[in-house]
C-alpha cells in the first residue's frame, strides 16, 4: 500500500465504532502520524449500519476518499453496506460470522480474544491493537494512552485493556510479517504536538476567542456538538449556556443578550432555523448583532437528519421578512471554522447585523490534526458606547452604523420591532421610514470594505476555474491538485455573502467555469450569476446526503476536457 491509508470500520449503532475511532486516532496522533477521520451514521440509537473512515498519511490530509484499503467489519452485512467502495485491493478484517458471503477476508477473532480476557467489551481494544501494529505504531505509545484513559477505572481495567491491545497487536504484527498487509507511512514528530479536534470544537473555540459569553440553543443535529462543547467549558470561560425550550426562544434570548451587552450565539439546523427567521427579522429591524451557526443537512422537513448537504445557502440569504443587511460565512476547514467564528462576532458587533455561519454535518463531525490555533492576545474588540442623556439609538449617520449603547448609562436605549425614529420611538412618519430603510442598507458599503476575499489556488494563466464554497474545500483542492491539468485553478469562497468584487474578475478570466456544490440546484452558482452576471459551463452537484470524495471529483473534472 502507498503512504496514504484509508481504514474504515463498519458495524451497527451502539457497537463501539466511535470508541475504536477515538482510541485509534489519538494513538496515531500521539505517535506522530497525520490522521483524519469522518463518519456516516444512520438516525437511530441501535442497529443499522454506521461507518467511520480513518485516513492515515505521510502528509497532512483533510479530505474524504472513496477507496477503502482496510475494512474492519463488526457486523454481518457491513461489507454489502459499503460494496460501492470495496474493490479487489481492499483488505477485509473480521470474524467469519461478520463477513458477507463471496468476499475474501482475513479472520481476526476480536470477540473470542476479548472473551478469553474477560469480557467481549474488550474486542474494541483488540481491534485498535491490530490496526496499530499494521500501521506501525509503537506499542509503548498505545500502552501509555490506555493507561491514561482507563486510569480512573482501576488497575484491573487498565491491565485487561493493555492485554487486549497486546493480543491484537501481535496479530497485526503477524499479518505484516507474513506480507498480507504492507503499509509504508512516515511519521512526523511535529504531529505529536498538534491539536486533534472536530469541526464542532473548532467552532466552539472560535466562539470563545470571539468573546462569546452566552449561547442559547435547542439541540438539533448537526449543531448540537457546538452547544455541548460550550456548555462543557461554560464555567471555565464565563459562558451562560441555555438549552431553550424551542428555537423561537433561543434566538430571542440571544438578541436580548446582545441588547444587554453580551456576545451571544445560537446553533441550529435548517428546521430549527425556519423557526428563527422572525427573530432574524427582529434583529434586522432593531439593528442587533446576532451570530447563528446553521448546520446544514438534507431537507426539506426532517430529511436525512444525520447526513450532509449545502442546501440552505439561499434560505439563509433571504431569511427574515423585509430588506436588511446580513453576512454569510462558510468555513471549509477546521482552521476556517475557528477563525471565521471569531470573525463572526467582530462583524456582528461592528456592523450591528446578523451573521450566519453555514456549517454542515460533514464539517462538524470531521476532524484531523492541525497546528495550534492563534488566539488573540488582546480582548476581542467591542463597539459599545457609553450613553449620554441625549443618546439616540438610531442616530442618522453617514455610514448607517449608529453608536450602539446598552442599558446602564445615562441615556435610554429604546428598541422596538415597529419602525422607529432616531430615539427608537415608534413612528408612522413616512419620511422617517424612508430614511431608516436607507440607513440600514447603507451598512452594506461598510461591510463590503471588509469582505473576506476568495482564496485562489493554481496557476495565474489558468483556463479552467473550479469554484467551491464551505466544506467542499478539502476534496476540491485535493482533486484539482491531482487531476493532471496544469491550466486548472480553484477559487474557494469562505464568505459567500456579500460577494467579494474580485469574484467577477476571476470568473471573467476563465475560458471554462465549473462549480461544485453539495446541493441539487447550484445555489451558490445562482448567487454568483445574480451578483456578477456570469454563469457556469459545468455544475457538479451531489445531494444524496454524502460528501464528495476526492476520486469522484477527479473523475467528474476529467469528463469532457
Which residue stretches match the model-derived regions?
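Glycine-rich, anion-gripping cofactor-binding loops and their flanking helix/strand elements
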Residues: 48-85, 239, 243-252, 261, ...
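Gly-rich Lys/Arg/Thr-decorated short loops/hinges at beta-loop-alpha junctions or inter-strand turns
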Residues: 150, 174-192, 207-212, 231-237, ...
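Flexible, low-complexity linker and terminal segments
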Residues: 196-203, 208, 340, 345-561
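Short beta-strand segments
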Residues: 73, 93-95, 109, 268, ...
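Gly/Ser/Thr-rich loops at beta-strand to alpha-helix junctions
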Residues: 14-17, 133-135, 219-224, 248, ...
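Thiamine diphosphate
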Residues: 2-66, 70-79, 83, 214, ...
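Active-site cofactor/cluster-binding pocket
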Residues: 1-210, 214, 505, 512
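Generic secondary-structure signature for well-ordered alpha-helical cores
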Residues: 29-34, 77, 131-140, 144-155, ...
